[in-house]
Amino acid sequence: MRSESGFNRRATAVLAAWTLVALLLAGQAWVAGQVRGEPLAWARASGIWIVWAAAWAALTPIALQLAARFPLQRAHFFRAIAVHGLASVACALANMAIFALAAPVVGATQLEPTWLGTFTRLLGTTFILNVPVYWLVVAAARLERLARTAREKDRLEAQLADARLQALRAQLQPHFLFNAL
């Protein structure tokens, strides 16, 4: 069971990571607007990308739970792929639904008069870009798990080496005492 401080640390890391992604994408959108001669206000660019990233930040714990429950391992690989495939579609749709709801508030462009119209437009333009985001979260969780396993293996190997050294010392020490007498 994860401690509360561990949960807070992980939640803070998720929020910080998604905030960084939002700011990087907002910066890219702002620069692209300047280059095209279509200036985009920084507040508007950052608002748009913060909403997108906040939706993914809210969806990240779901992806992490699924990554832990259905790890991409040889034993049940196809089942895990199926679960994550469905989850990636569901999370992408959820992200677009949240963004379609918030888009008018943050000043997103190319909106339709209705939420459904905006959602449909997003479905056609950003769905294929949102699906891999889920897979990146799952891949990051997998890499973290592999790193944690490697650290644990190294720790156990160090303990084993130390135990062997202590056992060897215990075996050698009586012989020296006996020979000294």
Model-derived regions, located:
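Cytosolic coiled-coil signaling helices that couple upstream sensory modules
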Residues: 86-157
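Histidine-centered phosphotransfer motif of kinases
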Residues: 157, 161-181
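N-terminal sensory and localization modules of signal-transduction and trafficking proteins
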Residues: 1-82, 96-119, 150
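Alpha-helical transmembrane segments of MFS and MFS-like solute carriers/permeases
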Residues: 13-17, 86-87, 125, 181
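Hydrophobic alpha-helical transmembrane segments of integral membrane proteins
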Residues: 57-58, 128-129, 170-171
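Solvent-exposed, charged/polar functional surfaces in cytosolic regulatory/catalytic domains
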Residues: 65, 142, 146, 167
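Generic alpha-helical secondary structure signal
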Residues: 57, 61, 135-138, 179
